[in-house]
Swiss-Prot record:
Pathway: Amino-acid biosynthesis; L-cysteine biosynthesis; L-cysteine from L-serine: step 1/2. This is Serine O-succinyltransferase. Homodimer. Belongs to the AB hydrolase superfamily. MetX family. It comes from the Bacteria. Its EC number is 2.3.1.-, 2.3.1.46. The keyword Ion transport does not apply. InterPro entries: AB_hydrolase_1 (IPR000073), AB_hydrolase_fold (IPR029058), HAT_MetX-like (IPR008220). It comes from Litchfieldella anticariensis (strain DSM 16096 / CECT 5854 / CIP 108499 / LMG 22089 / FP35) (Halomonas anticariensis). It holds the Pfam family Abhydrolase_1. Residues 48-51 are annotated as: Important for substrate specificity. The record marks 182 as: Important for acyl-CoA specificity. Transfers a succinyl group from succinyl-CoA to L-serine, forming succinyl-L-serine. In vitro, also has homoserine succinyl transferase activity.
């Protein structure tokens, strides 16, 4: 299969934000466009929890990426203008070092010997990758969901190394609701006997637990209105299974099951647990001695795009307004958008009619 990934080895030991260290780190990434100068046209893109670095198609890998409508020649993130670097998160399972990677000290996967992961670790690894590529200053730091948290953390941690910020459907910290939700998802994984305390064989693991966790995630990534429009109460053909009183009866169940099985087959369970917890632990106020305002004052961006969706349960609009207001008070020129998509938190992935013009306009006015 085509593979556009490239890899950077960061020398160790790499100290982790909440303690522990890794002897070395590999970061997988993909790029589009041509780098100019010292990186003045570089756009650093962070991903959500589950995607790889394959954000868009390329000559090396023509398969569509997870943000295909957004990245490419003549698209909102125009690769004739920008050099786009998409980073596979530290802790993930698509090429970057994570719990599924081999621990050189043992010759076995790290599993739960992997140190506690934080958003700050993901960001520090991405910063190291940029510097290894000879890029000390990027034009824009961008991301959505976990990637938006990463972008905000990058802005706080490395002032003076970027010009603009794009934060979509993200937040300065997790809420009790999302912490509780992700805790239940992680519990579903750990309650599966196949998790085996994290010591399952490569390629194996708690498929049933991951499937349940993903179904719960899918439910919250979209909105009740969209579920109604897409599926209503449509039943499955031949769903009257007298031998199984709890057999699937509705189209929506079939959709969630198929999506969840696909995810469980491709994503490592321990990596999922670590990345999920990292989202819960993130709090920008830690970079301001407990004060969000003090933390955001470290950000020296010229401009920021902050956007959210009216139907997003996970990162509600009040959190987008909070980020926008904090940035404005810090002297950043903010372009703020509340988008009326019915597609919930995942709208940025699929609602090109709303998101593409917004991003295109913001970047068009960014010199």
């Amino acid at each position: 299969m085509p593979d556009a990934r490239r890899f950077i080895e960061l020398p160790g030991p790499v100290r982790m934000y909440r303690g522990g260290e890794l002897p070395s780190v590999t970061i997988a990434y993909e790029t589009w466009g041509e780098l100019r100068g010292q990186g003045d046209n570089a756009l650093l893109l962070f991903t959500g929890l589950s995607p790889s670095a394959h954000a868009a198609s390329s000559m090396a890998d023509p398969s569509p990426g997870w943000w295909e409508y957004m990245i490419g020649p003549g698209k909102p993130i125009d690769t004739e203008r920008f050099f786009v670097i998409a980073i596979n998160s530290l802790g993930s399972c698509f090429g970057s070092t994570g719990p599924a990677s081999i621990n050189p000290a043992t010759g076995q996967p790290y599993r739960l010997d992997f140190p506690k992961l934080s958003v700050e670790d993901i960001v520090a690894a991405a910063r190291g990758a940029c510097r290894a590529l000879g890029i000390d200053h990027v034009h824009t730091v961008a991301g959505a969901s976990l990637g938006g948290m990463d972008a905000l953390a990058y802005a706080v941690m490395y002032p003076g190394t970027y010009r603009d910020i794009i934060s979509i459907s993200a937040a300065a910290h997790a809420t009790p609701f999302t912490i509780a939700l992700r805790s239940i998802q992680r519990e579903a994984v750990r309650a599966d006997p196949a998790w085996a305390g994290g010591n399952y064989a490569p390629g194996e693991g708690p498929k049933d637990g991951m499937r349940v966790a993903r179904q719960l995630g899918i439910l919250t990534y979209r909105s009740a209105e969209e579920w109604l429009q897409r599926f209503d109460r449509e039943r499955l053909e031949g769903s009257d299974d007298s031998a199984n009183p709890f057999a699937m009866a509705f189209q929506v169940q079939s959709y969630m099951e198929a999506n969840a099985r696909k995810f469980a087959d491709r994503f490592d369970a321990n990596c999922y647990l670590y990345l999920s917890q990292a989202m819960d632990l993130f709090d920008m106020a830690e970079h301001g001695d407990g004060s969000l305002e003090a933390a955001v004052r470290r950000i020296d961006a010229k401009r920021a795009l902050v956007a959210g969706v009216t139907t997003d349960w996970l990162f509600p609009l009040w959190q987008q307004r909070q980020v926008a207001e904090l940035l404005e008070h810090a002297g950043v020129a903010v372009s703020y958008h509340e988008l009326g998509s019915i597609q919930g938190h995942d709208a940025f992935l699929v609602d090109s009619e709303r998101f593409a013009p917004m991003v295109a306009e913001f970047l068009a006015h960014s010199s």
